[in-house]
């Protein structure tokens, strides 16, 4: 399996999904992260919540950008495979193995496209939690 910052293998959908699961750890742990790093009123002087929120913001942005890049790259690669298989099928109408491979790749493409929707939900949830806890400590740049 590829490293979270590296290139993903788009051949095996289960491996692709596992990579995304690992890369989504930051989003899964955001509530815990905020609860353990953003101080309550009684501990305000011991931690700089502005710095903590800024670092978390940067980590979230990097994670979201990397995952989106990987998903879109795999969609692009799989789309190219589907296109090639469709062209081959036009030449060999009766090839059952080719048709089976085409259907498999089309299914994988649909699953990868659905990961974009999952990504949107995960990101929205993370930004909602981040904004609820960090809005008074850190104002992110307007690009979000």
From Swiss-Prot:
Coiled coil: 82-120
Entry keyword set: Coiled coil
Protein name: Protein MIX23
Pfam families listed in its UniProt record: MIX23
Origin species: Taeniopygia guttata (Zebra finch)
Family: Belongs to the MIX23 family.
InterPro entries: MIX23
GO cellular component: mitochondrial intermembrane space
Lineage: Eukaryota, Metazoa, Chordata, Craniata, Vertebrata
